[in-house]
Structure formats: structure tokens, C-alpha cells
Amino acid sequence: MNGWMGKIIRINLSEGRHFLESLDPLMARNFIGGRGLASKILFDEIDPAVDPISPENKLIFATGPLTGAGAAASRFMVVTKGYLTGAIACSNSGGNFGPELKFAGYDLIIFEGKAKEPVYLLIEDDHIEIRPASFLWGKVIPETVGLIKQELKESLGKTDWEAREFRVACIGPAGENLSRIAAVVTDDERHAARSGVGAVMGSKNLKAVVVKGSQSINIDKHDQLKNTLFLLWEKLKEAKSTGYNLPTYGTSAGVSFYNECGIMPTHNFKYGVFDHAAKINGEEMKKKIVKGSFGCFSCPIRCGKITEVKEEGKVWKGMGPEYETLALMGASCEVDDLAAIAKANYLCDEFGVDTISAGGTIACAMELSERDYLPEEDIGFKLTFGDGEALVKLVEMICKNEGFGKVLAEGGYRLAEKYGHPEFFMGVKKQEFPGYDPRGVKGMGVAYATSNRGACHLRGLTSLSELVGIPEKVDPLTCEGKALLAINFQNFASVIDSSGMCIFAFRGIWQDGTMEALLNAVTGVGFDSAEMLKAGERIWNLERLFNLKAGLTKKTDTLPKRLLEEPSPRGPAKGHVVELDKMLIEYYELRGWDQDGVPTEEKISELGL
Amino acid sequence: MPRVKIDSNKCTGCRSCEAICSLEHFQVVNPLKSRIRIYHEPGQRLYIPIISGPFTGAQCTNKTVKVIGGVEIDGCVLCPVASCPSRHLFVEPGSEIPLKCDMCGEPPDPMCVKSCASGALTLVEVEKYATDFERSY
């Protein structure tokens, strides 16, 4: 096969055995790869009603046909039933792990069962070994990666250079402690963080996956791929966002922009404008903490920012914070202290915690505390909005699973529920919102509500069209046509995720045939635009069916009361709420679902599910 | 003569050059078949592109340690020679044939330079063969 490696590893952790399977070409064509293929396998193989942290749940690491094939595509996906949401989870990470898995010769790894003792998986081409990992248990991410490299050198006789080439995807102490907001981290670079996938990995006693390979990714039409790449690079360079903003400031470039648009979630989504945004925006970050850039495998955008915060006696080093972190830990908690946000971010990175969910949960706790619903003695200190020190302290407590951190590590939904005020939890399907207030960008409202993995910025980023103008600018404050816009974005995002492409390359490939050209050049399958988008729709419907079987209903396709009933108090979105009901009815209809949001028989057979 | 100038301060470790080099020369994507590799120092976030030169069958004796960005790096790693007994690098996996940069393109217009968005690799004109000390790190 070209593009796909054609092999799947199935690891039975309970028995400590592995099996090799071959990839069915027809299934690869129908579900493309990555997110789609893994969702299909999960749907077929597990009962969607299963307990996410039971051995019956499966954990799938999946790459797409474009992963590692040279086209700004480095993503791999972690697909499982999410511990945070109870819905299908697909967290997605860049870096170098995904491509390396392909170079080792595999498209997917499926983990089943539960290991008796902590283990890690070592893959070097044909050599697949489950090794004991007790010496790694409890260690933070950089230490874990370091110890694995050391073991490779000392026990397995790898040279320094070889050990360097092994790529690691692992969990930190948060995942081991089954925190519902735990992440899977690749090399201390990039994170597949959302929906609690780290806890699922932890529940299987799987500490890390270590991989290195020497195989080639075969390309069907290499000349066509090269020419398409030249065009893509040119386009990405010319666009202001991918050619200047992201390379220069990283995603933090969004802070000023989204604040001006009035959708910066502030004070736990009460306002859409953060007055102190200038203290945490891209320019400020560049001036104060950014030391360099990092690019994921074969990506010309290189949006990762290497940063450093110095304080007395200690230098904190790491990557980020990214826009979502600045929005949630910054604006939503009203913290304008960049150093504090960066420190909280580094802690999350070290311990393997999702920064979006951690920020959203802490903002929720701040609101509950200010309204006197959350007693001070439960937290241990007085918690108010804008307290940077408290933010770092709470994040540390979440990371180390200490004191009140144990409650926060369960996520915002369970926190708000515990104290009797679920209306202050800002999220969908128990997952916290990312950094866009949908009252100022209505399409995001319906995209959030219908997102299969809970509130998410990557499933249907309609703000690209509504605010940035890709592919065309529409009014962000109306509901007209937003259901269709959300559907188009959701279907296309499914294709991008499944192929292994990064959503940031969106700007260069949206609706101009580049995506098809890349897929065809690499795989030689001959996708046309209609078939590709059909595959996207198929994947979306499959995830929906999984969720319905898992017990989610139309009732979970909703937004918090605040966004539906409380008009935005100021900024460009002043006076607006999200008119969700109207959009939702239209959305179900356009999707070909009945009024309860269940895909109809015709739709299911049309998609061949 | 045209040469590729390396400025490691600008390198972001994206490895586009590795991918495109193997695509150009082997019609596949495989960093191990690339004639340019990115050395990285994980904790330090240091990325250094290394381009393969001629193969040598003997190991030299003047081992050095270079300090780049405050990090000590084994001089062998930065050596512009392709593969040698002390460094198993730039050797095609399977066939074990050493690989050497051929300044691809006619006139020379190397793919790695084309693919480098960060500006770490540039094509320059030099009067004589660029040796180690002419590269800037």
C-alpha cells in the first residue's frame, strides 16, 4: 500500500502478547485512516456503554495516510472512550511520534485489556516488546523520557544517536492517578490532551509507547506530491496567519485578535472581552518569554514556541502557553500575569494534564467560590478571580493529586455538580470549552453543542470563516446558514484529522483541491472531492452512533444556560445570546437525522455504515 | 561554487528537509534515507542540521567537543563527513550504502533549501569548498 503502511499492531496487555494484522484497503479508503479508521475499529470492537477505565475499553493510537508523508502532516490520534466525557474521544497530537510510528511500519496500535504491572511498549521495526515500567511509574514526563533513553542506552546497547531517535508517547502522574483531565504527551513536545485519554492509558497500566523505525512511507506519485507541496508551502507562506502570525507568535497571536472580536472567554465566560489581554498577548509573550520556535515533523508553519520563565533560584523551561491556555487559564480566570500562566502551563506539561480543561475547571471553581457556593475551607485558601498565585497552586494540586486538587482533577462538570450549581460549568458533554465565546461567533455555538467529543475547537472551527474569512467571511452574529457552515467544517475536519494533516494547514487546503491532490499523490487511491467529504460525513455519523449507543442523547447537544440566556454584557457581541434551538433543528435536518438527533436508516445506509 | 549554508539558530527541528530529501532521491519518505539530518538535544531544544559529505573508511583521532548555545556537543556529531566507523549515520538502511549530498537540482537548487521555511538552510556561493569552520552555528 502507498501512504498507509498496511499493518496494525494489536497488543493484549492482560496476556502480554501482541498480534499483527493487515489493514483492509477498502476500510482504509472508506475511513481514510487515523481518527476515522480508529473510530470504526472502536465502534466495531467495544460496547459503547463500557466503563472507560475498565479493561474492556480499548485505546487506539492511529496515524493517517499523510502522517509523516511530508505535507505539514505529523498528527497521530489517540482514540478511545473518553474518561472525561463518556463519549468517543479522539485527541490529536503533532510532534514526531506519529511519523516515527509509520517509519516503524505500522498505521495503528490497538491496546486491549489491562497490564498487571506498569509496562511500556517498545517498538523498533519488527521488534515489539512489552517491558516493565515500574521504574517509570510516578515520574514526570521529562524524567520519564530521560529514563527511557537511558535504559535504551544502558540495557539495550543503543548508541547516543540511536537513543535520540526513539520517540516516546507517555503519560505523567496525572494519567496514573486517573485524573479525568489527563493527557498523553509525546517527547515533552506535543500533547494529545483532551477528553481524559491519559487516564484511559493509565488505567491500562501503560506508561509509555517508545518507537523507532527504518521503513519508508511509499508514495504513489512522488512528482505530483512534490509539486503539490511546493504550492502548499507557497500558499501557507503567503497567508498572513500561517506565513507570519503563527511562525512569529505561535497560537498566542490569537489573543489580541479574538479579544477584539469580543469572543475572549473572560470571568468564566461571563464577558467576551478581557481588559488585560494586552498583558498576555502574542507580542507580550514574544517580548518576555519566547526563546525560539519548534516545528512538528515536516511542517513549515512551526507554531510551537519554546519559552522560558526565570524566577529566583529557578528557571522554568517549556513550550507554550498556547492560545487556548492563555484564554482559559488567563482570561477565563482573569489572570493577567503571563509568568503565572506559563508556570501553570509548564506544570500541566510536566505532569500530563490538559491545560484547557484545567483552566476551565479552575475558572469554574473561582466563580463558585466568589458566589460562596464553594466553602473556603474545602480549598484551603481564599480563591478569587485574577489570582495568579492561586492558579499555579491549584494546578500544582491537580497535578500532584493533593487536597482540593483531587476534586478539580475530576473536571469542571463534576466540580459544579458536587457543589450543586451545574450551571456554572462551561462546557459541553462534560468537557470544558476552549477559548471562543460562542455568543460572539454563533457558528461555534452549534459546532460546540453537536461536537462528538464534547466542547472542542478542532471539530468545527467555524470561527475561521466567521471571523478570519476562510474560505469566505460571513457575519459572526447571525444564525443564518451557521448549521450548514458547522456541518461543512465538521466533515472537512474529520477528513483532515483522519488523514494526519494538521488543522492549521487548513488555510492552504480548504476547498481548492489541494487536500484531494495530496491524498491522491500519496495513496494513489483516486479520491475526488465528493468521496472525500462523504468519508468525512461517514466518520462524523459513526462517532454520533457510538455516542448514542453510549447513552448520550439530544439533551447533551446543548450549551450552558449562561450562553443561551445571559446576553453578553459588552464588546462587539453585546446583547447577544446563542439561539441554539433554531440552529440545532436546522442542523439535524441538514445532517439527515431525525428530530432527536438520531441518524435515520436512509442516512446510515447511504453512508454504508 | 554553490553550497548550503547552515544557521542552526534558525532551525526549528521540523525535518521538512529530511522528508523532501528522501522523497527527491528515493521517491519515498524515510529520514534514514535522507542526506540531511537534524540533530536535536531534547531537554535543550537545540536543533542542528547536518549535511552528509563524502564517506570515509577510517576514524579520525582528533575528537573534539563543541559548545553550542551553552550545550556541549560531541564533535563527531557535527562532522561534515558522511559515515565513518564512529558514526553510523547517512547509511541507507538495508543496503548499507553510504549516502552523500549531491546538491540536487540543475543548476544546484537543493530540495532541502527549498523546503526550509525557517531560513536555517540557504544556498550561498563560496570560492572554495566550505569546511567546518566556515559554517556558522
Where are these regions (language model features)?
Chain A
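Intrinsically disordered, low-complexity segments enriched in small residues
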Residues: 1-92, 96-609
